[in-house]
Swiss-Prot record:
Oligomeric and partner information: The Tat system comprises two distinct complexes: a TatABC complex, containing multiple copies of TatA, TatB and TatC subunits, and a separate TatA complex, containing only TatA subunits. Substrates initially bind to the TatABC complex, which probably triggers association of the separate TatA complex to form the active translocon.
Primary localization class, coarse: membrane
Database matches in Pfam families: TatA_B_E
Organism: Neisseria meningitidis serogroup B (strain ATCC BAA-335 / MC58)
CC terms in the record's Gene Ontology section: TAT protein transport complex
Name this protein carries in UniProt: Sec-independent protein translocase protein TatB
Domain of life: Bacteria
One of the protein's GO biological processes: protein transport by the Tat complex
Family: Belongs to the TatB family.
Spans traversing the lipid bilayer: 1-21
Length: 228
């Protein structure tokens, strides 16, 4: 620790021997050794403290670098999210107000009202379609009849037979509107009246059962007569 050689130590020992004498020299040497040991321990503790501080400083620097990198990543993610939100807002602002809403459907689009009943317009449309088809068929049939009459010439219409008359009546009856018959339904109360249990009779039966279980004959104690 101290840059002393062997010659310097011998010189110091001779001076101490002359100054202190042979009696006090061993005690002085022990005291000097203790002081040197304390000094070495103090220097070692200071050196260890310096090493610990250096390690803590390195760890502190590494921690600061890690926190700086994490903050940089966080800022970059925040900027990316802000840019995406701005793009979405720009897209939504570019749309018209009615284009932002989804397509609205009403019960009328399905041919029913709010209660689920069919609308009269749908029924009329169906009947109009049937009526539109029927005249075309009639005109086609009349044109075909006229064509046949033009080819064969004017002929007398045949008389209506019984079979044709029955078929016509059947078609007329089926075309008529069906008659809806209303049926009256009456409800009859069929609840069965349950009888109320007779509590008095049940109580009497329980008392009679208890009496039956009682012993009928009681044992009489026998007295012993002591003979003198």
């Amino acid at each position: 620790m101290f840059d002393f050689g062997l010659g310097e130590l011998v010189f110091v020992g001779i001076i101490a021997l002359i100054v202190l004498g042979p009696e006090r020299l061993p005690e002085a040497a022990r005291t000097a050794g203790r002081l040197i040991g304390r000094l070495q321990r103090f220097v070692g503790s200071v050196k260890q403290e310096f090493d610990t501080q250096i390690e803590l400083e390195e760890l502190r620097k590494a921690k600061q670098e890690f926190e700086a990198a994490a903050a940089q990543v966080r800022d970059s993610l925040k900027e990316t999210g802000t840019d995406m939100e701005g793009n979405l807002h720009d897209i939504s602002d570019g749309l018209k107000p009615w284009e932002k809403l989804p397509e609205q459907r009403t019960p009328a689009d399905f041919g029913v009202d709010e209660n689920g009943n069919p609308l009269p317009d749908a029924a009329n449309t169906l009947s109009d379609g049937i009526s539109d088809v029927m005249p075309s068929e009639r005109s086609y049939a009349s044109a075909e009849t006229l064509g046949d009459s033009g080819q064969t010439g004017s002929t007398a219409e045949p008389a209506e037979t019984d079979q044709d008359r029955a078929w016509r009546e059947y078609l007329t009856a089926s075309a008529a509107a069906p008659v809806v018959q209303t049926v009256e339904v009456s409800y009859i109360d069929t609840a069965v009246e349950t009888p109320v249990p007779h509590t008095t009779s049940l109580r009497k039966q329980a008392i009679s059962r208890k009496r039956d279980f009682r012993p009928k004959h009681r044992a009489k104690p026998k007295l012993r007569v002591r003979k003198s």
